[in-house]
């Protein structure tokens, strides 16, 4: 049986993403004064964004990843938990967390508390997207502010699909 493909509307084009990666990297470089950074990508959604972003950074970077989950195997919501942690120490290092989207802010707050417990010298957050409805979570670097949409592409998925899209899109209403 063949699944119906959902109609995806372009929200942010591939060209706009490329331009914003360059300007965002400049903002990060200026704010961090070119310090060596440990760039921590939040899996799985941020891997494409992180890959593009670090190629624009001009200071030395090392990369690491972590993964959290807020759903069980059946897709039911549950308490946040760490599924995969950093593989290197970050004590006394400048850390930049790279997240795909800030929606409610609860995941990012969980990540921030977890990483601060490891005693970094500094901790800054960079999110590709922040929903305009989310006002409480501090994010130092934001790629784009968007409306409350379900976004796919550029590493973000819906049931494991659409990560490969070179742009950010949203599901069009029928």
Question: What does each of the following model-derived ranges do?
Answer:
Residues 1-174:
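PRPP-associated nucleotide enzymes
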């Amino acid at each position: 049986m063949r699944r119906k493909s959902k109609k995806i509307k372009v929200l942010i084009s591939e060209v706009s993403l490329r331009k914003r990666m360059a300007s965002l990297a400049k903002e990060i470089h200026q704010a961090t004064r070119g310090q060596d950074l440990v760039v921590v990508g939040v899996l799985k959604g941020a891997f494409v964004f992180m890959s593009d972003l670090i190629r624009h950074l001009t200071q030395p970077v090392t990369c690491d990843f972590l993964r959290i989950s807020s759903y069980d195997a059946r897709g039911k919501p549950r308490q946040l938990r760490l599924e995969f942690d950093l593989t290197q120490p970050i004590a006394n290092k400048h850390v930049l967390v790279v997240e795909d989207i800030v929606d409610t802010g609860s995941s990012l707050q969980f990540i921030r508390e977890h990483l601060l417990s490891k005693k970094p010298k500094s901790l800054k957050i960079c999110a590709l997207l922040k929903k305009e409805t989310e006002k409480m979570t501090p994010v130092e670097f934001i790629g784009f502010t968007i409306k409350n949409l379900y976004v796919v592409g550029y590493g973000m998925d819906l049931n494991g699909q659409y990560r490969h899209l070179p742009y950010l899109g949203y599901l069009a209403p029928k």
